[in-house]
């Protein structure tokens, strides 16, 4: 979800469209040599590539979260990272109908062949937990 600290949104009207989002400071993920583009999906309008000129670029999601919490701009964050801050009203969801594309969680292991039962159970548990988290947080998307 796209999120911002309330202080960021107190200085001007909350954006109602992607065009209005250009009036706000944004936080990018990656490096300065890359173009900053958010891939956002809207149920009725489909997918768009929102190109922006970030005021800050960091190279990991924890850095993005910290920058947003400290009021440095608007950024997309995985709901599993932002939901506690949203519940406490420390972050506000911006343009909730526009959702960033889903991320992927990777688990690295040598091979499925000969996979230890404990590792198989761990992978099954993680899949179950992420699926449940998705269901629990559906209202924030």
Question: Could you say what each language-model-derived stretch is?
Answer:
Residues 79-88, 98-141:
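C-terminal effector-binding regulatory domain of bacterial HTH transcription factors
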